[in-house]
């Protein structure tokens, strides 16, 4: 199998007994990218891999260099049985919070799959609450379970590409390099030029800049 675990002990009630991965044929891994960014959507990916065509080298996307990650991304989208993306945009993030937006993006990613999985493995300790499909959450699942690693790679590469496009529209903030995360340069430019429409106004660094601007009016 493509998963790194063959047996998973379930602690919650989603699946009442010890979860034997082998009895499920269509296993989807789900992960997200962009929770800590100050800019843009949070993006989730859902991936179903062929059990007889394992992809070697899968790992947490954050631990891979750019070239390795991109090569794996191409391999996954070429050879996966199914894969999809789900977005939660800036308005949805600011309206609720990043944790709820993360779950919403995950739910959309699974919904967008062209093939319905019979098991979902999710990175983290919270689930959107799938009612028709058994699921299980795993802390650091992107580093422990290959199918979740695959989802983490799809989500990160997709979001990085979106940030490169945004950088071309707003080159002052360095989005192509920092991907919207609060680097020194990004925060400096944010304070100097103010936020754009894609900045998450509910996030403290952006909220602080907006407050400073309003005080000066």
Curated annotation (Swiss-Prot):
Spell out the GO cellular component terms annotated for this protein, sorted alphabetically and separated by semicolons.
cytoplasm; ribonuclease H2 complex
Q: Which residues form the RNase H type-2 domain?
A: 25-215
Q: Where in the cell is it found?
A: Cytoplasm
- Family under the similarity heading: Belongs to the RNase HII family.
- Chief location category: cytoplasm
- The Enzyme Commission number assigned here is 3.1.26.4
This protein is called: Ribonuclease HII
Any keyword Lipid metabolism?
A: no
What organism is listed for this UniProt entry?
A: Blochmanniella pennsylvanica (strain BPEN)
What does the UniProt keyword field contain?
Answer: Cytoplasm, Endonuclease, Hydrolase, Manganese, Metal-binding, Nuclease
The free-text function statement in the UniProt record for this protein reads: Endonuclease that specifically degrades the RNA of RNA-DNA hybrids.
Task: Spell out the reaction equation it catalyses.
Answer: Endonucleolytic cleavage to 5'-phosphomonoester
